[in-house]
A protein has these predicted regions:
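Long, highly charged, low-complexity intrinsically disordered interaction regions
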Residues: 1-73
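Short, compositionally biased low-complexity segments
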Residues: 23-24, 93-97
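Alpha-helix termini
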Residues: 40, 92-94, 106
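Alpha-helix boundary/capping detector
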Residues: 44, 92, 100-101
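Acidic-histidine catalytic/liganding microenvironments
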Residues: 77
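Structured, non-catalytic alpha/beta "coupling" segments that mediate domain-domain communication
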Residues: 84-95
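Long, charged amphipathic helices and adjacent flexible linkers at domain junctions
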Residues: 99-107
Length: 107
């Protein structure tokens, strides 16, 4: 059985780490874990997030692939149900819209 988030030192928990050190100190997996909130009996939220990151078939070190994933593709991961998949898709859409605004400002 994996270690529970509550059993980790506070400095290793995503919420506490963000609060204490800022968002820039978190890994991509930790940021995704905050979005999906909870894990399963078998996997922590960070573990689920790491599985999501493994869906990157381009193997480039960026997160653009998340924007192309469908709700159904997120749900292929055990522990990612419809609600978590929709949350991830919503955040991806927000990121897309922020990027559009930023690109517009640069012109």
């Amino acid at each position: 059985m994996p270690i529970k988030m509550k059993e980790l030192p506070e400095t290793e928990r995503p919420y506490e780490k963000l609060e204490q050190y800022g968002a820039k100190t978190l890994t991509n997996a930790e940021l995704l874990a905050i979005i999906i909130k909870t894990g399963t009996k078998e996997e922590t939220a960070v573990g689920l997030a790491q599985q999501i990151l493994k869906l990157n078939t381009a193997k480039e070190n960026n997160l653009k692939f998340l924007m192309d994933l469908t709700v159904e593709e997120f749900m292929k991961i055990k522990g990612i149900g419809k609600v978590k998949a929709i949350q991830l898709k919503a955040v991806s859409e927000l990121a897309t819209r922020i990027n559009v605004v930023e690109n517009y400002k640069e012109k």
